[in-house]
Amino acid sequence: MKKKLLWLLLVVCVVIFPLTAKETKAETEGDWKYSYDSTGVSIDAYNGTDENVVVPEKLGGKDVVAISCYAFSQNETIKTVKLPLGVDYIGFSAFSGCNSLEEITIPSSVTVIQDNAFRNCTSLKTIEIPE
C-alpha cells in the first residue's frame, strides 16, 4: 500500500510541477538585454554608452515591468536614468556602483525596491518620483 501511494505521489509531482513552472526567455534589442515571461519584460542589462538613459516602455512588444538584479551595476557612464510607468520592481543592486549616476526618475508604479539597489552611487543627488 505504501509503495502504491508513493508511486501515485511521484506521478502527481511529475505531472503538476512542470505546469507551475514559469517559462522565461532571454532576448537582446539594441542596447538592452532582457528576459520576459507572461507578466512582462525584465531589464537584465544595459550595454549602451549613453549618459542619459531612458528605459523603453516596451521591448519585444511587451511591457517593461522590472529592473533585474545588477542590471545597471558598475556602469560608470550613466548620469541620469528615467524608468517608464509600469515598472513595479527594482532588483537587488540594480544600480549599485554607478558612480556617475546623479539623477533617477522612478515611476509611481514601483512597489518594490530591493536592498542595495543604489549602493555606492556616490554622485546620486536626485531621486524623482512623479505622482
Would you name each region that the model predicts?
Residues D31-S38, G48-V65, N75-Y89, C98-V112, ...:
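Structural signature of tandem-repeat unit edges
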Residues F17, Y89-F92:
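Aromatic (phenylalanine/tyrosine) cluster motif
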Residues L9-P18:
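Bacterial N-terminal signal peptides
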